Swiss-Prot record:
Tissue expression: Ubiquitously expressed in all tissues examined.
Alphabetic keyword roster: Acetylation, Initiation factor, Isopeptide bond, Methylation, Phosphoprotein, Protein biosynthesis, Repressor, Translation regulation, Ubl conjugation
Protein name: Eukaryotic translation initiation factor 4 gamma 2
Residues where N-acetylmethionine is found: M1
Family: Belongs to the eukaryotic initiation factor 4G family.
Cross-link Glycyl lysine isopeptide (Lys-Gly) (interchain with G-Cter in SUMO2) residue location(s): K574
Assembly behavior: Interacts with the serine/threonine protein kinases MKNK1 and MKNK2. Binds EIF4A and EIF3. Interacts with MIF4GD. Interacts with DAZAP2.
PANTHER family: EUKARYOTIC TRANSLATION INITIATION FACTOR 4 GAMMA, EUKARYOTIC TRANSLATION INITIATION FACTOR 4 GAMMA 2
Other comments on record: This gene has been shown to be extensively edited in the liver of APOBEC1 transgenic animals. Its aberrant editing could contribute to the potent oncogenesis induced by overexpression of APOBEC1. The aberrant edited sequence, called NAT1, is likely to be a fundamental translational repressor.
Domain MIF4G: 78-308
Gene3D superfamilies linked to this entry: 1.25.40.180
Location of the W2 domain: 719-903
Statement: the UniProt record of this protein carries the keyword Repressor: yes
Amino acid sequence: MESAIAEGGASRFSASSGGGGSRGAPQHYPKTAGNSEFLGKTPGQNAQKWIPARSTRRDDNSAANNSANEKERHDAIFRKVRGILNKLTPEKFDKLCLELLNVGVESKLILKGVILLIVDKALEEPKYSSLYAQLCLRLAEDAPNFDGPAAEGQPGQKQSTTFRRLLISKLQDEFENRTRNVDVYDKRENPLLPEEEEQRAIAKIKMLGNIKFIGELGKLDLIHESILHKCIKTLLEKKKRVQLKDMGEDLECLCQIMRTVGPRLDHERAKSLMDQYFARMCSLMLSKELPARIRFLLQDTVELREHHWVPRKAFLDNGPKTINQIRQDAVKDLGVFIPAPMAQGRSDFFLEGPFMPPRMKMDRDPLGGLADMFGQMPGSGIGTGPGVIQDRFSPTMGRHRSNQLFNGHGGHIMPPTQSQFGEMGGKFMKSQGLSQLYHNQSQGLLSQLQGQSKDMPPRFSKKGQLNADEISLRPAQSFLMNKNQVPKLQPQITMIPPSAQPPRTQTPPLGQTPQLGLKTNPPLIQEKPAKTSKKPPPSKEELLKLTEAVVTDYLNSGNANDAVSGVREMRAPKHFLPEMLSKVIILSLDRSDEDKEKASSLISLLKQEGIATSDNFMQAFLNVLEQCPKLEVDIPLVKSYLAQFAARAIISELVSISELAQPLESGTHFPLFLLCLQQLAKLQDREWLTELFQQSKVNMQKMLPEIDQNKDRMLEILEGKGLSFLFPLLKLEKELLKQIKLDPSPQTIYKWIKDNISPKLHVDKGFVNILMTSFLQYISSEVSPPSDETDSSSAPSKEQLEQEKQLLLSFKPVMQKFLHDHVDLQVSALYALQVHCYNSSFPKGMLLRFFVHFYDMEIIEEEAFLAWKEDITQEFPGKGKALFQVNQWLTWLETAEEEESEEEAD
């Protein structure tokens, strides 16, 4: 990752001064004393002031006391922040976010400490990265900004704040030093001690956790997409003096970031980049120099993309869950129903069902921390073995509504279990004929549980009982820890098959004391659901008729609420929604413009109500487009009417321009896309449309038929449709070259540019490309007129070379005016030169000559040349041949720059 990742500065602070860890880990707070990076060297209003030597001892003591009080206050704040982070769960997220914002973030110093604690927690608990990323998103929006008002950034880009700048700076520091802590142990010649193995495992978790955290922040747009690409390039590129076998850590980080944020990066505009990344990964995957584990990681990542980023089942559910989700998973995976706490106000005496509610405690001791999450576990008692203390209710009490120990009511008590009395107890129960009760149900449940246990993780099939004191709501410190050290807080859950449990009876056997064993799960009693006469779902034909009736009534009456209610009552399945929206569009096509607008409003309203989605609309829109040949027989202007629907959908933010453009590329349904833009300009205004279109990054040439995909033809088509205002630079290209030919003096050219081109475009890459192309075309036409039949493979004469140099020198002031201190614009100028040489079939030595002239005349800086070399975009043709011609010169430039920097360092 390059310096661009730290958008707001290069401040750093030590990763060792934070911490997070799981509950029970030793508390380490950000130190303020003796940490020059964290406090002493921090510039700004909180920096320590110089005190003159003549100050009195009293002043010194007062300053020392104030400093000590300040440090104590900071430590208290950081302790509070750590406590909040330890309690962070999906359910308490909003509440704890507010608490965190109110801890007293009054200075940049405190904000740095908060960021340090959050990042360390995210690195130590990678499973919760998404939760900490959401927390960072909230803080980036709501935390105080100490940088003052920021300059306007690019449209659609998140505003840079102090929190975001410091967060990115911290992550950059972690990224650049990602393998440092792991390499310390890998370079040891002697075998590692158990403590060192554990420290190495923790360091590796943090390394991968940082990469995953960067990916999660990228999903939320807190880290720009270009930064994510720089991370990937850094991890993937071949380092100098580094063998392939030593790239294992970087490639593991690469696989982690691809799994996390790969789906977001893999879109149409970045497809060529992603293809290059994965081509490189495929080649590395076949290399025998890499360890087998790394090769398999690469293979898994490549296959993940081939399967459209749909992960295997093992990776689907790997994030933080709410308590309700945990209960549902217990029912689905373990076959155990864990009841939620009952609502207040319901009569406990009349409860029905296999389990009593946890709020009916009857002087019982609580289960502890687990009771808050799962409610009271059924069938639990106090003590073990014979003579245990009976619980005040049995799981079947709600059904029989009586218990010998409940309010003095006479009732029935459970018999002793087989597990309590061992083999003899089991034989005694069989002799009484009790084991036949519920035999069929038990056998069915047993086979079901045995089938489920095959897919059950090993930790759930171990022997042992559920102990509330052994439950931890957070994962173990590390899944890579020393295997000999079993974490103390490891949860253990044992499934007891129904066949091992006693049958229920209403009276105990003669001579036996009623007892209840500890931690035995009762059998599941499946009640037959009450028979209800459900109507079968409506058929497709019925749904279409209902849709037609609702839409016709709405278009006639204009009552949108009734229409939405009618759609709800249809209870249409999700897969039918696109067809329903298609029907809405088609029914309004042959009606008035007012009715078409009503239909568009109805679709937008269905989206707002959560009934339909943007994808549903796009599917419906494309369905209608496929029917256009048939519809055009009765409705000749059907494409214009559909353009109105698309335009209104964009205005109401139902879809974006880029989403609409994607299925219409390469001239599909041409000129529908241009008709949509016309309608947008008509319904809104040109400036609004121009800004929206530029934000969409749609390539207009790709929207035309393949035969028309060139600049001249595109300008001609856009002028015919009245849309040339979207591309002011296209007209500029022809007019600027005419102006240069008319008067090539730099003063005249600069004045013409100022008078005719908006200042906003002066820093636009497209403008720089056109400016350089115009200069190069003029120089080529003057040095080698078109009438001359010169061979591009022959070298130019001395006079031509001198004339070329003088013309370039005359344009130098104009070039420097627009390129100075703008490396990105200088790279665009080099691409303009590359394309000019490509269009001229690469005349002998031309590219190298201009590279040398640009360097000697200080038009282009060294950094821009090297950035052009490393850039792998395929937007401009001829890059491969261009690199071949100037590669030796670029190598010289790179080594010269390194030698110069070494001399400066000496």
